[in-house]
């Protein structure tokens, strides 16, 4: 076998890993649109008003970033099959930048959470909605582990982050970072402004600990009043599902243009 043939085989293996991972996790990835008091928030470091998330329980529970849904008046979730739901906020851990949402649907496709520890140089894939370009897939490697980001205006200090060169842009926040088998290894959370190839994700152990704390608080307080669909009534509007055109076209709706 020639060197050129070996290179072609390596590229094919890489391509198959990326496409396979995207096909595995894609059905569980969601788009999140936020209305805040005073209208739609259009600009923030993290692309507030538009974000990503993923279904981690088939009864409609969704993981995303706390900053994506902070101060939300209304949260709308678009599934990969085009259905749109109003969502309730189950709980949030701002220090970890993790939030759990729930929609009134069940028997949904679920993203598998990984178990193996990450290694520097490992292939990772991000799926999300940068700038409203729905279900965008980007690939890269784990550049470093245990990174810290200093706090600043409107954001908290963050520790123990995964650094990747996977392309991350406003709107990616809250989406899954997955391994070559499509298993979630982190939640995309931030990019370095004015830089390329510097993205950061929350590691899975931090996410799992945040979910456990949210569940403990949820179990220790009285149950919220629920709508007939099962979504907690923490939002204005009805918990409805509307069938729209497929989001896979990648074309952002003009009313959702933000950064």
Roles of regions detected by a PLM:
Residues 1-235, 240-242, 254-258:
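Serine-dependent protease modules
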């Amino acid at each position: 076998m020639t060197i050129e043939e070996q290179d072609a085989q390596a590229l094919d293996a890489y391509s198959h890993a990326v496409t396979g991972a995207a096909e595995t996790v894609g059905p569980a990835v969601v788009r999140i649109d936020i209305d805040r008091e005073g209208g739609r928030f259009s600009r923030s470091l993290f692309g507030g008003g538009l974000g990503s998330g993923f279904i981690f329980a088939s009864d409609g529970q969704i993981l995303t970033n706390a900053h994506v849904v902070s101060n939300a008046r209304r949260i709308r979730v678009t599934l990969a099959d085009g259905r749109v739901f109003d969502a309730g906020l189950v709980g949030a851990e701002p220090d970890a930048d993790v939030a759990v949402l729930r929609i009134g649907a069940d028997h949904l496709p679920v993203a598998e959470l990984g178990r193996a520890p990450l290694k520097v140089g490992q292939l990772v894939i991000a799926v999300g909605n940068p700038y409203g370009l729905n279900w965008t897939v980007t690939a890269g490697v784990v550049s470093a582990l245990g990174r810290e980001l200093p706090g600043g205006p409107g954001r908290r200090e963050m520790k123990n982050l995964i650094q990747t060169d996977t392309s991350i842009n406003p709107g990616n926040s809250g989406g899954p970072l997955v391994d070559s088998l499509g298993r979630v290894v982190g939640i995309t959370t931030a990019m370095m402004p004015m830089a390329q190839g510097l993205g950061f994700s929350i590691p899975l152990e931090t996410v799992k600990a945040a979910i456990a704390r949210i569940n403990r608080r949820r179990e220790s307080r009285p149950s919220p009043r629920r709508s007939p669909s099962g979504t907690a009534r923490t939002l204005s509007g009805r918990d409805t599902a509307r069938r729209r055109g497929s989001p896979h076209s990648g074309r952002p709706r003009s009313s959702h243009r933000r950064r």
